[in-house]
A protein has these predicted regions:
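N-terminal maturation segment of proteins
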Residues: 1-335
Length: 335
């Protein structure tokens, strides 16, 4: 019955005149159809999950791209004065010297949250009195997560964080990331400025890559890169989302073991073992796993559009925060 309803819905989309909107809605139907088939017990190949469920290319990140990300990090580590040892050793030395002690995290969190909200209110969307409380957790399969309705931001204390990494989490999860996107889309729908499907930005479907792209570009969207440490953290994040995309691919397509995935994330992505175990666990989930690719492809999409926005920044922000998109429809809207 669900698949028949989706067939009927797909047919109703055909007359829509807007090519961009039609592209998004057809992508959503395709994604929902894949989810229905998956939760009905049908087997879907990992490649089909990527293209149909997540709406990203069915391919790993090329080795050449990984090498280029390493080269960029090498330049940043050199600028920061870390020139001895392998690149991985230099990155870990840089991080280790800046890890926050658990007892220091609440104060740093409050400081960063206030500044992120100030910048978001000025540059993206007025967030009003919305805020998030820190909720420290352990033994969970994520580094950070926001609960919009409860107003909690979970921070996994099993994964050590620097100030720059905490800044990324705040920007990704709250201001101007996930929470801000939810606040803005809810407001425009309530005011009648957008159709209710704008609220689909929260769904794990082809919209997921846009959520993660906005989150990972959060620091840049509010012009919050303050020093080389922030730039290095962004470089590490891009590398690790690329490595996470590849680890998930090889677990499902190449027959990698958990141990191989963890080793790859540590050795190629320069990740902590605790984070690598968390990511590998997520990658192995039959539904959640393919969405790991949404971080890489979503970030690269929003990054490329932001970098060439020039005088059309408001047009970009309008589509990121007041509309709902897939990667394909966003590129089409901003072409």
């Amino acid at each position: 019955a669900a698949l028949e309803a989706l067939d009927s819905l797909e047919a109703s989309i055909a007359p829509i005149p807007s090519k961009t909107r039609k592209t998004f809605l057809l992508g959503m139907v395709r994604s929902l159809r894949a989810a229905v088939r998956l939760f009905s017990g049908e087997h879907l190949s990992y490649q089909a999950k990527l293209t149909d469920l997540v709406g990203v290319p069915a391919e790993p990140v090329p080795d050449e791209t990984i090498a280029a990300l390493h080269d960029e990090l090498n330049v940043l580590m050199t600028r920061l004065g870390y020139t001895t040892g392998t690149l991985g050793e230099r990155v870990r030395t840089w991080q280790t010297g800046r890890y926050l002690e658990p007892e220091a995290i609440p104060a740093v969190f409050e400081e960063l949250m206030a500044e992120a909200q100030r910048r978001t209110d000025a540059m993206i969307w007025p967030t009003g009195d919305y805020t998030m409380r820190l909720n420290a957790v352990r033994n969970v399969p994520y580094a950070g997560r926001c609960s919009f309705e409860e107003g909690n931001m979970d921070i996994n204390l099993d994964v050590r964080v620097t100030r720059a990494a905490m800044k990324h989490l705040v920007a990704h999860e709250v201001f101007p990331g996930h929470s801000t996107q939810l606040l803005s889309t809810r407001a425009v729908v309530e005011r009648g400025e957008a159709s209710p499907d704008a609220l689909l930005c929260t769904v794990n479907a082809v919209t997921g890559a846009m959520q993660e792209g906005i989150g990972d570009q959060g620091i840049d969207l509010i012009d919050w890169v303050e020093d080389e440490n922030d730039a290095a953290q962004i470089g590490v994040r891009r590398l690790q989302t690329a490595a996470g995309t590849n680890a998930a691919w090889h677990l499902h397509v190449s027959g990698w073991t958990k141990a191989q995935s963890i080793a790859y994330l540590c050795e190629v992505g320069f990740a902590q073992e605790s984070w690598s175990k968390v990511r590998t666990g997520m990658a192995l989930h039959p539904f959640r796993g393919p969405f790991l690719a949404s971080y890489w492809f979503g970030n690269e999409t929003v990054k490329s559009l932001r970098e060439r926005a020039d005088g059309k920044r408001e047009h970009l922000l309008d589509h990121l925060y007041r509309h709902v998109h897939s990667i394909e429809s966003l590129r089409m809207a901003l072409a």
